[in-house]
Design a protein with these regions (language model features):
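Internal amphipathic alpha-helical repeat/solenoid segments
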Residues: 41-56, 80-94, 125, 129
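Bacterial N-terminal signal peptides
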Residues: 12-21
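An alpha-helical repeat/solenoid feature that recognizes helix-turn-helix modules
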Residues: 28-32, 50-76, 90-117, 134-161, ...
């Protein structure tokens, strides 16, 4: 269905669809939360198929993962892949990180990442692997994404590739977004004290690293990353912070829950409750990014994209048919 027409149908049918949902928030299941979130995302999709949040290509790729996790939204997936295919063909997805995002989306949607937009995206990532295992000159965050992409495509990263990420871990137990730990310059959180170092160990990069290593690693952590997650917990709202002092946010909470799932560990008590609390209005379906005081903020598409797989405890990489498979009808706020 044309995206504009689908949006119109959303407005007309929203009230009818919502009649099927439980009357109280306590009765809402996680599958229904995911369904409502996926519908909210679909309602934000633009006519060209993109779902822009943090970045058009990356966020659209992540939206496909959310749709697959929830099940359904087939026309939204098709339109998103059309957008991504066009971006690949135009050469706009040429970095390690963007290619990795697209590969995960394409594979999860049941398509061939080795022939997409005129490119073999899997080979393009593999061709960037250096002798030391580093995938190109990418940030630690993008290296972890690339490992997940290779794993999604059915490949097990080499010892060197996994070893590079293991060696990048900060002594505090987490990973920093940009650069690997430098024993000669960094403190335990991978901060060198200079005005040019903007990143310390954070929950988001750490969660992606854990998912990549738990799925296909060869080696062991130098420091337990789950101890890092424990210390990054926000005592006020019960979720996880990006880094100390930021407070609970949906994206960080979602990724940490997925990291626990990837290691087949139970989410710490209250963690999933904290994620659910940031989706205060099931009729809207969207998750807030974070709190405004003690109240969740407005619905945010980027936060909702992150929350949908996590509320179902589905870790990356996703496989085709990761959700229930039943068609859904999109709705908005």
């Amino acid at each position: 269905m044309d995206p504009m027409r689908r949006r119109a149908v959303t407005i007309i049918t929203a009230a009818i669809v919502l009649l099927a949902l439980p009357a109280t928030a306590g009765a809402v299941t996680d599958a229904e939360r995911a369904d409502a979130g996926a519908a909210y995302i679909a309602a934000q999709q633009r006519p060209n198929g993109s779902v822009p949040a943090f970045s058009p290509i990356g966020s659209t790729s992540d939206a496909v993962l959310a749709f697959v996790a929830a099940g359904g939204q087939r026309s939204a997936i098709r339109d998103a892949l059309r957008f991504l295919r066009a971006q690949v063909r135009k050469g706009h997805a040429s970095t390690v990180g963007l290619r990795a995002k697209v590969v995960q989306a394409v594979v999860a949607a049941g398509r061939d990442a080795r022939s997409f937009g005129g490119e073999n995206l899997v080979r393009a990532i593999r061709s960037r692997i250096r002798d030391d295992g580093h995938i190109g000159r990418s940030a630690v965050f993008d290296h972890a994404l690339a490992m997940l992409a290779l794993e999604a495509a059915g490949l097990r990263p080499s010892r060197a590739v996994a070893g590079w990420l293991l060696d990048a871990q900060c002594p505090v137990g987490g990973w920093s977004y940009d650069a690997p730990y430098d024993a000669g310059a960094d403190n335990r959180s991978c901060f060198d004290g200079s005005k040019d170092d903007f990143f310390t160990a954070d929950t988001n990069t750490t969660a992606y690293a854990v998912m990549a290593l738990e799925h296909g690693a060869r080696g062991a952590y130098a420091t337990n990353p789950f101890a890092f997650f424990r210390d990054a917990r926000d005592a006020t709202h019960g979720g996880w912070e990006y880094s100390p002092g930021f407070g609970t946010d949906t994206n960080s909470t979602a990724l940490v829950i997925q990291a626990y799932a990837s290691a087949d560990r139970s989410t710490p008590s209250g963690g999933r409750v904290a994620l659910r609390a940031l989706q205060p209005d099931i009729a809207c379906g969207g998750w807030a990014y974070s709190y405004e005081g003690d109240t969740p903020g407005p619905a945010n598409v980027g936060a909702t994209i992150a929350a949908v797989p996590a509320v179902l405890r589905l870790a990356f990489p996703l496989v085709p048919g990761g959700g229930s498979g039943a068609p859904r009808t999109s709705r908005g706020c």
